[in-house]
Structure formats: C-alpha cells, structure tokens
Amino acid sequence: MYTLKKSLGQHFLKDEGVCRQIISVLQERPVERLLEVGPGGGALTKYLIEWPSIEFLAVELDEEKVEYLQKTYPSLQGKIIHQSILEIEPPFVGSFTVVGNFPYNISTQILFHLLEWRSQVECAVGMFQKEVAERVAAPSGNKVYGVISVLIQTFFTVEYLFDVHEQSFNPPPKVK
C-alpha cells in the first residue's frame, strides 16, 4: 500500500460518489488531452484511464505514490510525471483539461500556475478548500472577492459545483 505524508498536504479522496460526480462534470465537454494533478492513491485515476481516445498524463510529486500507481495501474507506465505541478511546463502540445483533488496547502499556487498556462488550459475541474473555492468564484462586490477572484475570472469562467464533506477524505482535513 502507501503512507500518507502530512508534509505534502495529502488528504486522499475516498468517496466513490464524489469521484463519480467529478467524472460526470468532466464528461460534459469533449476532452482530448487530460492532466490529473496529484493522483495520490488513484481514486479518480481509475476512472480517467478508462476513457477511450484521450491522451492522459498525471503529475505526482510523491515517489511512493508514483510506484503504487504504476504497480496498481500498469497502463500508467510512462504517463506519470514525477515532479511538482508547480515546477513543470505544460505537458501537452495544444490545449488540455486539468483535473485533480488539489493539495489544499498549495491550491492557490496551482491556480496561479494554471494562469500561466491559460492559453492551453481549456477547462480545470478541481477539488479545493471551501474557502479558496468561494474566493475564486466570488462575484464582484462580495466580501471575499479579491485578487485571485479577479485574475481567475478574467481568463476563465468559474463555477462553484458542490460541497464535499470532510469525511470523504482519508484522513479528513481539518478545514472544509
């Protein structure tokens, strides 16, 4: 199996219903190339690798998780970038979609990184700490509307999709 690393902000999604909701949102639009950020134990990955006709890559910093994923899902051989999302260049030529249960401790940094890739990122579906998601999706004039709201909303259409209970994660995060 694998161990969870608090230093990497690891809280793995374990609720299959939430996984299916995320997959359903992704399936609402055509996807040709897909980057999964922080696949961890593969809760979303197991669904994503079954999609026909997509070019799939994952980026995972934790070597133990990379080894686990490659052993559990042999089709991932050569499809996992073993680095931090914050340190890589766009992994595809052309446009792509991003999905992930983003580590809460670097989720704002990930959003700024995706802004750098804005000409290529068609869509991003991510799990964020509730406070971050509310700030990103806040309308002008809202008390939490700020720099991140302005920047992301300038280049992307933002939609707050649904809340996820902390018990849907292992271990449950201390924040929503």
At which residue positions do the language-model features occur?
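Catalytic cores of RNA-modifying enzymes
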Residues: 1-176
